[in-house]
Curated annotation (Swiss-Prot):
This is Fluoride-specific ion channel FluC. Keywords: Cell inner membrane, Cell membrane, Ion channel, Ion transport, Membrane, Metal-binding, Sodium, Transmembrane, Transmembrane helix, Transport. Pfam families: CRCB. It is found in: Cell inner membrane. NCBIfam families: crcB, PRK14196.1. GO terms for molecular function: fluoride channel activity; metal ion binding. One of its GO terms (biological process) is cellular detoxification of fluoride. Signal peptide: none annotated. HAMAP family: FluC. It comes from Variovorax paradoxus (strain S110). The chain crosses the membrane at residues 5-25, 37-57, 71-91, 97-117. The lineage of its organism: Bacteria, Pseudomonadati, Pseudomonadota, Betaproteobacteria, Burkholderiales.
Length: 125
């Protein structure tokens, strides 16, 4: 029971630091919170890569899956920040930007998850 907990904690720590790094790199303010969008889009792509890779590696230790998906990608991506940012835009009277931000996160993440799966499938073919 200790190994899964450690795997998740280690992955989550690295993912959260990566998200923080993206927020610093993209900076605050501007048209839309680009760091949060980048974290969610990168996470969407990487979860697709992980899904397809795990399919090709059925004997992979479950601790790796926990570390990568539950831990790292759980720490990297952020639904709570996304929600807070969109609601703040609505409260500030910027419904168009709020809608665009929500569409970019949702549509972009779904597309990149699909692209991640297709990327691994193409490389494995």
């Amino acid at each position: 029971m200790l190994l899964p907990i450690l795997a998740i904690c280690m992955g989550a720590s690295v993912g959260a630091l990566a998200r923080w790094g993206l927020a610093l790199w993209f900076g605050a303010g501007g048209f839309m919170p680009w760091g949060t969008l980048a974290a969610n889009l990168v996470g969407g792509y990487l979860v697709g890569v992980a899904i397809a890779s795990f399919h090709l590696l059925p004997d992979l230790d479950p601790a790796w899956r926990l570390a990568l998906v539950t831990g790292f990608l759980g720490g990297l991506t952020t639904f709570s920040s996304f929600s807070a940012e969109v609601v703040t835009m609505l409260l500030e009277g910027r419904p168009g930007v709020a809608l665009l931000t929500a569409a970019a996160h949702l549509g972009g993440s779904l597309f990149l998850t699909w692209l991640g799966i297709r990327s691994v499938q193409a490389l494995a073919a």
